[in-house]
Amino acid sequence: MTRVLTGVLVLSLSESDFNRLADDALEEISLAVETKLDDQVEVELQEGVLTVDMADGGRYHINKHAPNQQIWLSSPKSGAWHFACSAPGAPWVSTRDADTSLGELLRDEIGAATGVYLELTL
């Protein structure tokens, strides 16, 4: 089954498939941030919630939201975002702007703040 969000066709996944995809995405972000920015940020990933505390005091809060099959992001730069997966292996795409993916948004915002641009496949 599929759904359409802001012009983006997204999958309706089984609960286990959604959790696997969302957990993989959160793990990828956590690993990339820890690897590239370990001395500049504090990272914590617990039970589907990823928190990234920036040196400038900003905090990224990223979590999976199973009822809507989305990943939600709270950004100190751009506010609240919701992302849905259009297909396994595809980027997590914004539900408000189909041209914005979770990986691109994090790469650009964290890169602008730190000078280090993350390589994310999300």
Specify the residue positions occupied by each region the protein language model found.
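N-terminal intrinsically disordered, cationic/polar leader segments
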Residues: 10-122
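N-terminal mitochondrial targeting presequence
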Residues: 1-11
